[in-house]
Amino acid sequence: MARALVQLWAICMLRVALATVYFQEEFLDGEHWRNRWLQSTNDSRFGHFRLSSGKFYGHKEKDKGLQTTQNGRFYAISARFKPFSNKGKTLVIQYTVKHEQKMDCGGGYIKVFPADIDQKNLNGKSQYYIMFGPDICGFDIKKVHVILHFKNKYHENKKLIRCKVDGFTHLYTLILRPDLSYDVKIDGQSIESGSIEYDWNLTSLKKETSPAESKDWEQTKDNKAQDWEKHFLDASTSKQSDWNGDLDGDWPAPMLQKPPYQDGLKPEGIHKDVWLHRKMKNTDYLTQYDLSEFENIGAIGLELWQVRSGTIFDNFLITDDEEYADNFGKATWGETKGPEREMDAIQAKEEMKKAREEEEEELLSGKINRHEHYFNQFHRRNEL
């Protein structure tokens, strides 16, 4: 048993060693997060963030994240990391978000930016590569955005992906693979997957061409030779004995008529079978415009609007390894999700108990006040 555990541990360590982690943030060092994250000063009215685990949590320190603090505000904050390209690699983007204020209208999504982003002036017009996460507004909008920037345009997934709308922490994961497949997960479970080119309506941008027919493949029809003649000499005859060439000229040898070209003769090299071939990707076109590649990823941030504040963002991760992301999610959100719900349930019971006690006090106070009122009225009548 011990040997098996050691082997499992070794495999896990090997996986960690093979994974490339481009960015990881858990906010475990207190206020030092301000050294890594930069608040935009583009607009003095932007809302501010604070580090908080909220009113209820699974672990007071581990569940601390960036929390919005002001109602009816835009928010803009970002963090840099070493620029990289995901060309030929899987790209995994993951984070947790908790709308403990029971979101009525506002964003809970993140954005991934190119390395040349101007952090100090980050705003709604700043170009981004990827926008991913929940967006809620009223009864109509309760969706997960997955927007990709491609060829100077933003393209959104055409499928309606529902988000979570309760007040608990949820784990959101986006996986983009080099084979142009993708996966969207919530709480570790796949809720949508498919093809990037089809689910973003990008098929026209990924062109396909038919390769030229093989040069050694015979054509399906043959043309009549340019020197084709309808008649030919009758080789069985000879010049007449009394024919005088000086007087009569050249002897016109008898000619025989050839059968018509179409009259049952089959020209050589004819193949009536259809030449079968498969469509092939135009690799030159795709190399220049690949639908899942971003050349200069260098920042992650929050740029959103909220009517009611209180959302907490935590456990940010950008990596090239799906298994690492899965394990990271289990080690963070997976460890605290249960205790978080337990604490919320306890608080709810306490609040209900307190509300009943206050109601009973009000009722009791009302009865006492009524008795005092009747008593005073009785004495006034007696005095009269």
From Swiss-Prot:
It comes from the Eukaryota. SUPFAM superfamilies: Concanavalin A-like lectins/glucanases (SSF49899), P-domain of calnexin/calreticulin (SSF63887). Glycans are attached at residues 42, 201. One of its GO terms (cellular component) is endoplasmic reticulum lumen. Testis specific. A motif (Prevents secretion from ER) lies at residues 381-384. Disulfide bonds join 105-137. An alpha-D-glucoside binds at residues 109, 111, 128, 135, 303. Residues 1-19 form the signal peptide. Sequence repeats lie at residues 191-202, 208-219, 221-230, 234-245, 249-259, 263-271, 273-283. Residues 20-197 are annotated as: N-domain. Keywords: Cardiomyopathy, Chaperone, Differentiation, Disulfide bond, Endoplasmic reticulum, Glycoprotein, Lectin, Metal-binding, Repeat, Signal, Spermatogenesis, Zinc. Residues 295-384 are annotated as: C-domain. Residues 191-245 are annotated as: 4 X approximate repeats. It is found in: Endoplasmic reticulum lumen. Residues 249-283 are annotated as: 3 X approximate repeats. GO terms for molecular function: carbohydrate binding; metal ion binding; protein folding chaperone; unfolded protein binding. InterPro entries: Calret/calnex, Calret/calnex_CS, Calreticulin, Calreticulin/calnexin_P_dom_sf, ConA-like_dom_sf. Can be divided into a N-terminal globular domain, a proline-rich P-domain forming an elongated arm-like structure and a C-terminal acidic domain. The P-domain binds one molecule of calcium with high affinity, whereas the acidic C-domain binds multiple calcium ions with low affinity. Component of an EIF2 complex at least composed of CELF1/CUGBP1, CALR, CALR3, EIF2S1, EIF2S2, HSP90B1 and HSPA5. During spermatogenesis, may act as a lectin-independent chaperone for specific client proteins such as ADAM3. Required for sperm fertility. CALR3 capacity for calcium-binding may be absent or much lower than that of CALR. Belongs to the calreticulin family. This is Calreticulin-3. It comes from Homo sapiens.
